[in-house]
Amino acid sequence: MLFAQLNEYMAEVGLDASEQQKKQLVDFVGMLNKWNKAFNLTSVRDPEQMLIRHIMDSLVVSPHLKGSRFIDVGTGPGLPGIPLAILNPDKEFVLLDSLGKRIRFQKQVQFELGINNISSIESRVEAYQPEELFDGVLSRAFASIQDMLQWCHHLPKSDGCFYALKGQLSEDEMANMPQGFRVTDTIELVVPKLDEQRHLLRVVKQD
């Protein structure tokens, strides 16, 4: 059932994946649903809604990623990082979260589903100092872009960028971009079966 729905949704937005990748995505929903009962990883309880609100909501970002090394800050149970890693095995994803139960879940997903291009790290973002900087800093966890840039400013390479996953856009937020940063793209995302606004903002540092 979920497999057929995933096929339909991915075709609707023009995304390609192998049968193995689709199986990993559906199995991820199964693990999230199972672990959620004990560990309260997401407020979404229904697997069909997880497929829409977590899997497809993450995957529609994929065509807009530039580079090969990414960090997902405040990833929770691995969103959007794990679906994006499954769809992009040639890219590397670091999943950062400060809560141990979320990291344990991610590591179990990595083990059970055989995902080799993710690293899960338990840390607060301000305390995390990567050995190598990132092409892209992703997050759907921050309430405002200002917060994201304040806490994550040390993570991208000089030519890297921030990818802020947002719902409805706030004019105030867009008008009050912190000094030294510039929005290069505002992309309206379409998620199948989701009648809510979704946007991706690409932000770069200015010299």
From Swiss-Prot:
Protein keywords: Cytoplasm, Methyltransferase, rRNA processing, S-adenosyl-L-methionine, Transferase
Catalytic activity line of the entry: guanosine(527) in 16S rRNA + S-adenosyl-L-methionine = N(7)-methylguanosine(527) in 16S rRNA + S-adenosyl-L-homocysteine
InterPro entries given in the database record: rRNA_ssu_MeTfrase_G (IPR003682), SAM-dependent_MTases_sf (IPR029063)
Localization: Cytoplasm
Sequence positions that bind S-adenosyl-L-methionine: 74, 79, 125-126, 140
EC number: 2.1.1.170
Source organism superkingdom: Bacteria
Cellular component terms per the entry's GO annotation: cytosol
Gene Ontology molecular function terms on file: rRNA (guanine-N7-)-methyltransferase activity
Gene3D superfamilies, sorted: Vaccinia Virus protein VP39
Function: Specifically methylates the N7 position of guanine in position 527 of 16S rRNA.
HAMAP family: 16SrRNA_methyltr_G (MF_00074)
Family: Belongs to the methyltransferase superfamily. RNA methyltransferase RsmG family.
PANTHER family: S-ADENOSYL-L-METHIONINE-DEPENDENT METHYLTRANSFERASES SUPERFAMILY PROTEIN
Name this polypeptide is given: Ribosomal RNA small subunit methyltransferase G
Organism: Shewanella piezotolerans (strain WP3 / JCM 13877)
Gene: rsmG
